[in-house]
């Protein structure tokens, strides 16, 4: 079991449920816009949000955002240790730094002192795209071993100051490298791990890479908090993270939709129906399985196994509830009837 840290009261590691994070894509200086996005993330199921703090103006805005945020906030810091101190003093629940790029040991010590005083954990964020040149020369390119060595070098900097309230991430845009780094790290250390594939590309590729990388580790029992990185609205990252956790069997809240890929036997607009069901239930917290099937081959069987489901016919469909057929309706009446019954469950 990993060590546990507390981020604004949210436990990470130590056997706690895996925590979902995301990062805002607003300008941090846009206080109202940032708060609006934080609230959207919270409504989608995000538990911790991270913001970029690139300068002192952003640090001042970050402090204003912290006052009204419904979520614990992480300040993402690079290069200037004074920004980390300002963010910690402004209300950050966690500081994300790369100790190797904020200056000498005295500057790391200054950050550690304020985080110790305010009981703020630090995430060491190692990234394959910003490894130290020395490690690149040693390993040739950003290998898993290079990422892990960088993480331990940074951990040592904090431990020298007596600081152990730490979480670690080792991210790569290459799935096998990220997975190998996390597995190697876990054999050597019990600090909690923040896992994710970085810079994943367009949404379709990003979802596949994230599901493979994060999912592989979760099935190994590795990973205490996750962030799905997508070139898209951050809210979509949260929905994807929830789905990954549900697919890995680590979350039971929310709807699990079972639907067939359609074939020549389908006689209803199943694709349209499934998309409408998914949209209507995306914020439903009921831990239920909903089957939306296109024909009578597998449809009745899947619908019977689900909590509630539809099996399509020729322009009509049957609704099953707890294995029992309860209604046969025209296609246009299926969705409202299904949603009404789900509401009553």
Features from the language model and the residues they span:
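Hydrophobic faces of well-ordered beta-strands that scaffold small-molecule active sites
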Residues: 18-24, 49-51, 73-77, 95-97, ...
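Glycine-rich, proline-tolerant flexible connector loops at the mouths of alpha/beta enzymes
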Residues: 25, 30-31, 42-66, 96-104, ...
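N-terminal active-site wall of soluble small-molecule enzyme domains
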Residues: 36, 41, 50-90
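Hydrophobic or amphipathic alpha-helical targeting/insertion segments
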Residues: 82-123
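Catalytic alpha/beta core domains of metabolic enzymes, predominantly
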Residues: 127, 135-282
């Amino acid at each position: 079991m990993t060590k546990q840290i507390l981020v604004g009261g949210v436990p990470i590691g130590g056997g706690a449920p895996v925590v979902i994070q995301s990062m805002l894509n607003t300008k941090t200086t846009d206080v109202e816009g940032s708060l609006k996005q934080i609230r959207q993330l919270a409504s989608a199921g995000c538990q911790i949000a991270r913001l970029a703090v690139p300068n002192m103006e952003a640090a001042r805005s970050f402090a204003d955002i912290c006052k009204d945020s419904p979520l614990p906030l992480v300040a993402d810091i690079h290069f200037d240790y004074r920004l980390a101190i300002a963010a910690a003093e402004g209300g950050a629940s966690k500081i994300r730094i790369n100790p190797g790029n904020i200056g000498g040991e005295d500057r790391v010590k200054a950050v550690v002192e304020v985080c110790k005083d305010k009981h703020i954990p630090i995430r060491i964020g190692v990234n394959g795209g910003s490894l130290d040149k020395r490690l690149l020369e040693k390993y040739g390119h950003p290998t898993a071993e290079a990422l892990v060595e960088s993480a331990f070098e940074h951990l040592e900097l904090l431990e020298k100051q007596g600081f152990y309230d730490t979480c670690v991430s080792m991210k790569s845009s290459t799935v096998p490298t990220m997975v190998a780094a996390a597995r190697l790290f876990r054999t050597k250390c019990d600090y909690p791990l923040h896992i994710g594939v970085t810079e994943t590309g367009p949404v379709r590729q990003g979802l596949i890479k994230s599901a493979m990388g994060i999912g592989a580790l979760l099935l190994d029992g590795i990973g205490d908090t996750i962030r799905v990185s997508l070139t898209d609205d951050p809210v979509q990252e949260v929905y994807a993270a929830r789905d990954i956790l549900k697919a890995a069997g680590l979350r039971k809240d929310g709807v699990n939709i079972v639907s067939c890929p359609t074939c020549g036997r389908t006689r209803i607009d199943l694709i349209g129906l499934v998309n409408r069901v998914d949209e209507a239930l995306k914020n439903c917290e009921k831990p239920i399985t909903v089957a939306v099937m296109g024909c009578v081959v597998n449809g009745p069987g899947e619908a019977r196994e689900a909590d509630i489901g539809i099996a399509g016919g020729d322009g009509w469909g049957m609704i099953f509830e707890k294995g029992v057929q309860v209604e046969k309706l025209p296609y246009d009446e299926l969705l409202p009837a299904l949603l009404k019954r789900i509401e009553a469950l």
